[in-house]
């Protein structure tokens, strides 16, 4: 890392990068990612959910710098495939800090998990149990149960999870196969908007624990999944959710139950850390007569169509697959007398579906101007393609020196509770490209005794 002087912010770095390419024809889209924001999120997590160990959902954003940062902080990792397991283990994360949290796995990838020492994994069907039994008899299994995800933005229970009735049958089958069922997992859906969903799911998990005890299983691990917001522009704030989860955990899984509790946050850690800068590569002015608009609120005689160099086949795939609603932010402050026009923003590909914003009001911009999109860290870079030959944006990482020092303190002490609280909200930032990042060896504070 190259640390910058005190007083710089991520926005300053973004403006600096824009200035650097302003005289060039190659005004490619790029990200600025504040890794210090991830450190702050980690501190916030442990304050709000002190009993719950985070296992970061790698699928949300698999950027190596993000994974390395969380590894140093002592987080565990929720992996869904052989490739994700390889990524996490390549940076020195021990298998005890990995859960293979995909209930439907390819047989060859189950074998890879066994050969890699990854024992914790989820299942939700008899077929999956039988697939696991032969290649991975020492697996430590969590039964994934279904939840009421009707209040989630991205629903998962239609695809994954066993009902309570089916759960007993699966536990009995696992007993016959001599497999170890060590716990229960669930996921209330991504973008959960009703914290009471967690309460019901935790209650259901308690029922399954009791079933397991009746059958002689030693169940000691509860995985409460994800569904936690990663930005502040949401109706239900993070602490509003955790204030409901904590009493439910204390009620159904009190401390003396000796149950270890983990979760699978993804967007919580990375959404707000990433800001995307896109450049206007083309512009079209459409008269009101051409649009056929009779909207009385549309007082201007034209609408504007902007074409930018990233789209729904790239970073904005989150619009299609994650139900995201992105908000454009002007890079330059408009003049007081600048008028506003009805605008739409489109991606660079030849597909007519490549639309980022259907309608918004902005001052008139020109080709070469920049538009920013905040909260772009979740389910963006991980699923971006190179359709039509358009490349993925470069990522520039920033972090403050005090945040870096705090991260080292957490690593060395291994217990977050021993780290003196620090206010890192207004710390100076540093900048480095992903390829130049070096991290010390990771700690093992998130290990689960399996």
Swiss-Prot record:
Keyword Lyase: yes
Catalytic site positions: 350
Activity regulation info: Inhibited by antizymes (AZs) in response to polyamine levels. AZs inhibit the assembly of the functional homodimer by binding to ODC monomers and targeting them for ubiquitin-independent proteolytic destruction by the 26S proteasome.
Domain of life: Eukaryota
Pfam families found in the cross-reference section: Orn_Arg_deC_N (PF02784), Orn_DAP_Arg_deC (PF00278)
Biological pathway: Amine and polyamine biosynthesis; putrescine biosynthesis via L-ornithine pathway; putrescine from L-ornithine: step 1/1
Class of the enzyme per the UniProt entry, highest EC level: lyase
Site positions for Stacks against the aromatic ring of pyridoxal phosphate and stabilizes reaction intermediates: 187
Entries under SUPFAM superfamilies matching the protein: Alanine racemase C-terminal domain-like, PLP-binding barrel
Keyword Nucleus: no
Cofactor(s) this protein requires: pyridoxal 5'-phosphate
Keyword terms, alphabetized: Decarboxylase, Lyase, Phosphoprotein, Polyamine biosynthesis, Pyridoxal phosphate
MF terms in GO: ornithine decarboxylase activity
Entry's Gene Ontology BP terms: putrescine biosynthetic process from arginine, via ornithine
One GO CC annotation: cytoplasm
Binding of substrate, residues: 321-322, 351
CDD domains: PLPDE_III_ODC
Subunit structure: Homodimer. Only the dimer is catalytically active, as the active sites are constructed of residues from both monomers.
Protein name: Ornithine decarboxylase
UniProt source species: Gallus gallus
């Amino acid at each position: 890392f190259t640390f910058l002087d005190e007083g710089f912010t991520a926005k300053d770095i973004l403006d600096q990068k824009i200035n650097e390419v302003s005289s060039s024809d190659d005004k490619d889209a790029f990200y600025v990612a504040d890794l210090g924001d991830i450190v702050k999120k980690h501190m916030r997590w442990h304050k709000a959910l002190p009993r719950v160990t985070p296992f970061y959902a790698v699928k949300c954003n698999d950027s190596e710098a993000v994974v390395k940062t969380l590894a140093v902080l002592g987080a565990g990792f929720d992996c869904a495939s052989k490739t994700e397991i390889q990524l996490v283990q390549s940076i020195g994360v021990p298998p005890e800090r990995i859960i293979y949290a995909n209930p439907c796995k390819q047989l060859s990838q189950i074998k890879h998990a066994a050969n890699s020492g990854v024992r914790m994994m989820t299942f939700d069907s008899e077929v999956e149990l039988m697939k696991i039994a032969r290649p991975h008899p020492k697996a430590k299994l969590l039964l994934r149960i279904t939840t009421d995800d009707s209040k989630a933005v991205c629903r998962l229970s239609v695809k994954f999870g066993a009902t309570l009735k089916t759960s007993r049958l699966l536990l009995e089958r696992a007993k016959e196969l001599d497999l170890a069922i060590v716990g229960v997992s669930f996921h209330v859906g991504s973008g959960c908007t009703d914290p009471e969903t967690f309460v019901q799911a935790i209650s259901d998990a308690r029922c399954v624990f009791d079933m397991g005890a009746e059958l002689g299983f030693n169940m000691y691990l509860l995985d409460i999944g994800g569904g936690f917001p990663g930005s502040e522009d949401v109706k239900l704030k993070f602490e509003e959710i955790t204030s409901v989860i904590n009493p439910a955990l204390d009620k159904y899984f009190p401390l003396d139950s000796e149950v270890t509790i983990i979760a699978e946050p993804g967007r919580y850690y990375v959404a707000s850390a990433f800001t995307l800068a896109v450049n206007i590569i083309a512009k079209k002015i459409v008269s009101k007569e051409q649009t056929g608009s009779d909207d009385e609120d549309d007082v201007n005689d034209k609408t504007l169509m902007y074409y930018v160099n990233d789209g729904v086949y790239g970073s904005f795939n989150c619009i299609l697959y994650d139900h995201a609603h992105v908000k454009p932010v002007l890079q330059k402050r408009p003049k007081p007398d600048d008028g506003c026009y009805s605008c739409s923003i489109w991606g660079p590909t030849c597909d007519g579906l490549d639309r980022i914003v259907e309608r918004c009001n902005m001052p008139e911009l020109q080709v070469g101007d920049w538009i920013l999109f905040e909260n772009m860290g979740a389910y963006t870079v991980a699923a971006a393609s190179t359709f039509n030959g358009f490349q993925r944006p470069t990522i520039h990482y920033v972090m403050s020196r005090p945040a870096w020092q705090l991260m080292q303190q957490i690593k060395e002490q291994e217990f977050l509770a021993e780290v003196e609280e620090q206010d890192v909200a207004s710390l100076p930032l540093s900048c480095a490209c992903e390829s130049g990042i070096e991290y010390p060896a990771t700690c093992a504070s998130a290990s689960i005794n399996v």
